[in-house]
Amino acid sequence: MAIAWGNTVTPAFRQKVVDICLKLGADPDHLMACMAFESGKTFSPSIRNAAGSGAVGLIQFMPATAQALGTTTDKLAAMSAIKQLDYVELYFRSRAGKLKTLEDLYMAILWPAAVGKPLDYVLFAKNDPKYPKRYLQNAGLDFNKDGVITKAEAADKVR
């Protein structure tokens, strides 16, 4: 089966992605695009966030997320990519049926509160007095440099 980024992974990986997406009601192309973006196009289960957040792997699992899934980022990093896909599925399972678009699938990774929201939903704002750091950490997603990062802007980077 041909899927986005399929030539960069093994046939077994591709098939597992397709199987996961059937269970989740998601498009395999969308999941592959998100994992390509999050892993710096490596699809490496051990790739770590360069900014030092502690995130690791195919969808950049944060330490607290790994713990909630019953593991650690070190254990995730030591897994094969195919084994880590079990945790990718587990992570998305609670949102099964709600990940119909690339934008919503990516929001489930970046900012889960935005799943199901309109494309102009504001994720981060430069002038947010309560959480200004959120914008700064994601400023690269503000394509039009207006000080606001919308759901659509964030997902454009994944396309």
Where are the language model's segments positioned?
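A recognition module on extended beta-rich or small alphabeta surfaces enriched in W/G with H and D/E
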Residues: 148, 152-154
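N-terminal secretory targeting signals
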Residues: 1-5, 156-159
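Catalytic glycan-binding domains that act on GlcNAc-containing polysaccharides
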Residues: 2-139
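Acidic carboxylate motifs that coordinate Ca2+ or other divalent cations, activating on Asp/Glu
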Residues: 142, 146
